[in-house]
Design a protein with these regions (language model features):
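Non-catalytic terminal/linker segments enriched in charged/polar, low-complexity residues
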Residues: 1-149
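P-loop/Walker A NTP-binding module and the surrounding RecA-like catalytic core of P-loop NTPases
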Residues: 118-121, 147-368
């Protein structure tokens, strides 16, 4: 893939123009800032390609919409990951006629998948209109129409993270313990480093030694610098990291914050303090405030999105652990009730199992 630094205009890597743009790599947009090569980090990795990296896009097999090989592999993993959610919904369409019973079964299946009452009602209302317009007569056709409706509902969530409008771009990451926050930051670091971005990590999760160590491992693996302080003040660590990022000409500063529940008011206030202190270090920062949510938690994830957004003003989401859950419908609930962009979704432990979110791909993988 081509790097981001030095691009003179906003650019989506490996993007395909149009609604069904499929990106082989994470879609990271380089903003118009153009030239922003910082100081080189010491000790460049001996081998630029780590063993757990997916192979570069190979020649795609002939098909209507050529997809890079890596994205084909991703689609297969996404489909497998969403099978639990998808099968309960697609089973509704195995009958021979379209009647009230079909719609009732579909309503139950969508609610069981944690789609939520509002999104379920909206999808069913839209589906009945589509069925009428298309004069559809068999359930298989209805399933295809539902996939179209779901893709349209999810469309507002599809957005690329923009890097390069500010130097450094400061990304603050929050999430409850167990959501996969630190791992997601590690994977994001790998993506950014692979796209020639100079990254600095801030271990502001100072309470959990394991979190600092985990982040340290990712820093070593990706040959990026890390600002860490045992038992230090999280806000102070964040301030130091942003200041260091500016001084060292970094492209991105990623701030890992302590995992917490939205009900822990004093901890939420601490997050707000970290955000304020980041702004003191850089008046325009943080440029992104991301929340990592566990897809397995279903409707609970939606409550987290609402609570963290109220406290911090979220700019994007990373939805992890969508593999093996029966609650993949939660993305539709988020789209209906709190449409904050989903920058990445995860369906596994591997680095390549975190990819950019594409509404149509997701709908097809779920209902295919």
């Amino acid at each position: 893939g081509q790097g981001l630094a030095g691009l003179g205009r906003t650019h989506v890597l490996h993007g395909v123009v149009g609604h069904q743009a499929l990106t082989a790599q994470p879609a990271i947009e380089a903003a118009p800032a153009g030239q922003h090569q910082g100081d080189a980090t010491p000790a460049a990795p001996a081998s630029p390609v780590a063993p757990d990296l997916p192979p570069p896009p190979a020649s795609p097999e002939p098909q209507a919409k050529p997809q890079p090989a890596e994205r084909q592999g991703w689609m297969a993993r996404l489909k497998a990951g969403l099978r639990k959610t998808g099968s309960s919904i697609t089973n509704v369409f195995t009958g021979t006629k379209i009647d009230d019973a079909l719609y009732e079964e579909l309503e139950d299946a969508l609610l069981m998948a944690d789609t939520g009452v509002k999104a379920t009602e909206a999808l069913l209302h839209d589906l009945k209109r589509r069925v009428k317009e298309a004069k559809a007569t068999d359930p298989a056709a209805v399933k295809a129409l539902l996939a179209g409706g779901l893709a349209d509902l999810l469309q507002p969530l599809e957005k690329s993270i923009v890097i390069g409008a500010h130097q450094p771009t400061v990304i603050m990451v929050a999430g409850v313990n167990g959501a996969g926050k630190t791992t997601s930051i590690g994977k994001l670091t790998k993506y950014l480093a692979d796209h020639d971005q100079q990254v600095l990590l801030a271990a502001a999760d100072t309470f959990r030694a394991a979190a600092r160590e985990q982040l340290g491992v990712w820093a070593t693996r990706n040959t990026v610098e890390i600002v860490s302080q045992e038992g230090g003040d999280p806000a102070a660590v964040s301030f130091d990291a942003v200041t260091a990022g500016k001084a060292r000409g970094k492209d991105v500063v990623l701030v890992d914050t302590a995992g917490r529940l939205p009900t822990q008011l004093h901890l939420m206030q601490e997050l707000q303090k970290i955000k304020r202190v980041i702004t003191k270090a850089d008046g325009s920062a943080p440029h992104e405030v991301l929340l990592v949510i566990d897809g397995n938690t279903g409707q609970n994830a939606l409550h987290q999105v609402k609570a963290f957004d109220e406290a911090l003003g979220l700019t994007g989401l990373i939805v992890t652990k969508l593999d093996g859950t029966a609650k993949g419908g939660v993305l539709a609930a988020i789209a209906q009730e709190k449409p904050i962009p989903v920058y990445f979704i995860g369906v596994g432990e591997q680095v390549q199992d975190l990819q950019t979110f594409n509404a149509r791909e997701f709908a097809q993988a779920l209902l295919g």
